[in-house]
């Protein structure tokens, strides 16, 4: 018979008591009262924070936006088709954040920073909050470096600087996305990281942009954040903040970044949809009262950082769509008041064959010539004035029958200047080529040509100058100034090319 030893048993019990680890885990949970239209009403979750992520039983993630006395309004980051009434929900204790790293370059991701290009997972060890505070006044410095778009009309008359926010506004189908993608293409070799955020676009349009960037080798320094028209409203609302978080990651690492939001009208509509479903009180045009804050907190994150923070920059090009050219609608006026200027694209100009269809008269850059190199300031000074005078004269000339010689000459010059501003899509020009083009037009060298010959002559002149006078490009790129030597070289090239061109045309 086995003897029971009391001391041995008591030792075992004592050891077990000592090893016992009393760990109390408190989980903030709730129950689904109602779900539908991308919104869930939750009972419980008493200690949830505004904007906190919550996790449903079947794995869907949501954001707690409405904290009411008897329930919590949660917007779903997914379709939520498997969520049932009565199922449990738990608070995660986290605010929305995404992984960030250099590995995102060249990839297409969604608003949750998950890859959607079928090229596997993206490795990242660092995380960044989707919504973070914008740099303060002391953290910034004034904008002084140019960000070249490659479009003559913009770089000469509506210059954009690194750290600026410049709105691109116009009706649908006026070339807003084309201006943005051309700007990305022109950053090749400029050491600028680009982030293109597509909000509520057709999947085919996004695919077309990605294909263009891949063909031109621009995806190497670009990240595309895409939430197409069939995505839940929550993800369309979050996409711009995800893009901004990625751009900020590079900005704080002393890099220059360019971010394009295409377009913020769709983000505002997604936010309106969410707000109305959450039964928040609607305001003007049924948008929520804080729709201004929606865009201001996003665009204020663009900045030129001070030298103590490494002088990185984040330049924002938000796009807003207007209805029949009405810039006085709610969202356009909001974004105009937040940004440092706007590029207005006109449907009338687009339809009359002037592309890019930039209305120079009402487009403005509030940074101005501070964002231009000295050489560009020297040649582009009188271009805007001459074009403004031409537009006024042209309107007057429609009613006047007989015009004096000076007026006729001014009209002829204006037509040629307007012609030199035309550019094909995906064909950005270097700053040296732009300076050469503007100088040729404003100094009357094109006056002897027919309007239809202007573009052909300029294309040939660019090739001739590059081949036969490479010193011109070297002087501009090294000194950033339009020196007398550069001017002499350019005059020679124009004269030689003009003689060749006239002989060709006569042949």
Swiss-Prot record:
CDD domains referenced in this protein's UniProt entry, alphabetically: ATP-synt_F1_alpha_C, ATP-synt_F1_alpha_N, F1-ATPase_alpha_CD
Localisation per UniProt entry: Plastid, Chloroplast thylakoid membrane
InterPro entries xref list: ATP_synth_asu-like_sf, ATP_synth_asu_C, ATP_synth_asu_C_sf, ATP_synth_F1_a_nt-bd_dom, ATP_synth_F1_asu, ATPase_a/bsu_AS, ATPase_F1/V1/A1_a/bsu_N, ATPase_F1/V1/A1_a/bsu_N_sf
Binding-site residues, ATP: 170-177
EC identifiers of the protein: 7.1.2.2
Top EC group: translocase
Main localisation: plastid
Keyword Cell wall biogenesis/degradation: no
GO cellular component, one term: proton-transporting ATP synthase complex
Pfam families xrefs: ATP-synt_ab, ATP-synt_ab_C, ATP-synt_ab_N
Keywords of this entry: ATP synthesis, ATP-binding, CF(1), Chloroplast, Hydrogen ion transport, Ion transport, Membrane, Nucleotide-binding, Plastid, Thylakoid, Translocase, Transport
Record GO terms (molecular function): ATP binding; proton-transporting ATP synthase activity, rotational mechanism
Catalysis performed (reactions): ATP + H2O + 4 H(+)(in) = ADP + phosphate + 5 H(+)(out)
Sites marked Required for activity: 363
SUPFAM superfamilies for this protein: C-terminal domain of alpha and beta subunits of F1 ATP synthase, N-terminal domain of alpha and beta subunits of F1 ATP synthase, P-loop containing nucleoside triphosphate hydrolases
Top-level lineage group: Eukaryota
Membrane topology: Peripheral membrane protein
Subunit structure as annotated in this protein's UniProt entry: F-type ATPases have 2 components, CF(1) - the catalytic core - and CF(0) - the membrane proton channel. CF(1) has five subunits: alpha(3), beta(3), gamma(1), delta(1), epsilon(1). CF(0) has four main subunits: a, b, b' and c.
Function: Produces ATP from ADP in the presence of a proton gradient across the membrane. The alpha chain is a regulatory subunit.
Family designation: Belongs to the ATPase alpha/beta chains family.
PANTHER family per record: ATP SYNTHASE SUBUNIT ALPHA, MITOCHONDRIAL
Name of the protein: ATP synthase subunit alpha, chloroplastic
Organism: Nicotiana tabacum
Lineage per the UniProt record: Eukaryota, Viridiplantae, Streptophyta, Embryophyta, Tracheophyta
């Amino acid at each position: 018979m086995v003897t029971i030893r009391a001391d041995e048993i008591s030792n075992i019990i004592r050891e077990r008591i000592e090893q016992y680890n009393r760990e109390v885990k408190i989980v903030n949970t709730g129950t689904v009262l109602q779900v539908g239209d991308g919104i869930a009403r939750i009972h419980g979750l008493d200690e949830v924070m505004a904007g906190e992520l919550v996790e449903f039983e079947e794995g869907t993630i949501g954001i707690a936006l409405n904290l009411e006395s008897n329930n919590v309004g949660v917007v779903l980051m997914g379709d939520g088709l498997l969520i049932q009434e009565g199922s449990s929900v738990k608070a995660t204790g986290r605010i929305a954040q995404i992984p960030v790293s250099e590995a995102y370059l060249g990839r297409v991701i969604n608003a949750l920073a998950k890859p959607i290009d079928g090229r596997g997972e993206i490795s990242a060890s660092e995380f960044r909050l989707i919504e973070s505070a914008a740099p303060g006044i002391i953290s910034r410095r004034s904008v002084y470096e140019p960000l070249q778009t490659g479009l003559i009309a913009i770089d000469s008359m509506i210059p954009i600087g690194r750290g600026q926010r410049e709105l691109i506004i116009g009706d649908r189908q006026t070339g807003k996305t084309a201006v943005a993608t051309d700007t990305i293409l022109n950053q090749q070799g400029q050491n600028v990281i680009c982030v293109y955020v597509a909000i509520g676009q057709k999947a085919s349009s996004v695919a077309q942009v990605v294909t263009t960037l891949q063909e031109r080798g621009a995806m190497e320094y670009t990240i595309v954040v895409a939430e197409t028209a069939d995505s839940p409203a929550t993800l369309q609302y979050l996409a711009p903040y995800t893009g901004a978080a990625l751009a900020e990651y590079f900005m704080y690492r002393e890099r220059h970044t360019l971010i394009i939001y295409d377009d913020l009208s769709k983000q505002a509509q997604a936010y309106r949809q969410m707000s109305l479903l959450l039964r928040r009180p609607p305001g003007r045009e049924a948008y929520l009262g804080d729709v201004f804050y929606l865009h201001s907190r996003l665009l204020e994150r663009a900045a030129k950082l001070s030298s103590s923070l490494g002088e990185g920059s984040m330049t924002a090009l938000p796009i807003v769509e207007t209805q029949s050219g009405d810039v006085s609608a709610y969202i356009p006026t909001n974004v105009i008041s937040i940004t440092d200027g706007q590029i207005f694209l006109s449907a009338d100009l687009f339809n009359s064959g002037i592309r890019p269809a930039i209305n120079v008269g009402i487009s403005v850059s509030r940074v101005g010539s501070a964002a231009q190199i000295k050489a560009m300031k020297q040649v582009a000074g009188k271009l805007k004035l001459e074009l403004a005078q031409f537009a006024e004269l042209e309107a007057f000339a429609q009613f006047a029958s007989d015009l004096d010689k000076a007026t006729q000459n001014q009209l002829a010059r204006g037509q040629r200047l307007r012609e030199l501003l035309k550019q094909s899509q995906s064909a950005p020009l270097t700053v040296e080529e732009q300076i050469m083009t503007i100088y040729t037009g404003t100094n009357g060298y094109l006056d002897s040509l027919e309007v239809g010959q202007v573009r052909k002559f300029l294309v040939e002149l660019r090739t001739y100058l590059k081949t036969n006078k490479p010193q011109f490009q070297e002087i501009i790129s090294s000194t950033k100034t339009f020196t007398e030597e550069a001017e002499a070289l350019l005059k020679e090239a124009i004269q030689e090319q003009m003689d060749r061109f006239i002989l060709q045309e006569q042949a």
